[in-house]
């Protein structure tokens, strides 16, 4: 797995106050031994931790969608914490997400913040905009021998809520082990179970890359050493994006906003 960052602005100093114009586009090359040659170069744009609410409004979301669509992805993966407030108050700010364009669609999983504000109403709202939620389930991307499997699981903390809870066994049950398996899971630490279920690569968010130095020390403790970037757990690769929004203060220090472009490569 290799990565390269294309900054959308000059990087002469650490960034503090942020806006929708300050995202970095990070390209990550992920080689999968089971990926069919026909899918070499398949692109996934990963968006995470948008945290719609407060100063992250409809205009901010629309700009993120526009930046995503300009990358012309084959698939969009939204790895949780898209919202930070009640549906009744914020639904209109989420509307631009319905404009995401990708040949194979936009898939999402829950993050911990969806549960703070009512996960079921938000899942229904975002599904109505065209997002497909993977709740301990998977989808086949492509056709026949020219395909891979995309799985998604509920957030690590969701077992506290009725009808929810991470279930990797269910998400991977009955799958063809000869097919590549990409997993969407909000929290990086979920990889420690995913590695035992045949996952080839897990895409996660949650950490914000620490968001504001030196908070990253606390984040690394909570996620058992996982903060941002690439990791390897046995045969399972992990990529943790810094996310395209922020939580709390409109501030990021040494952890810029990120839109991730994952390029799948056949070995």
Feature locations, PLM:
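Soluble catalytic domains of enzymes that build or remodel membrane lipids, polysaccharides, and related
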Residues: 22-27, 31-267
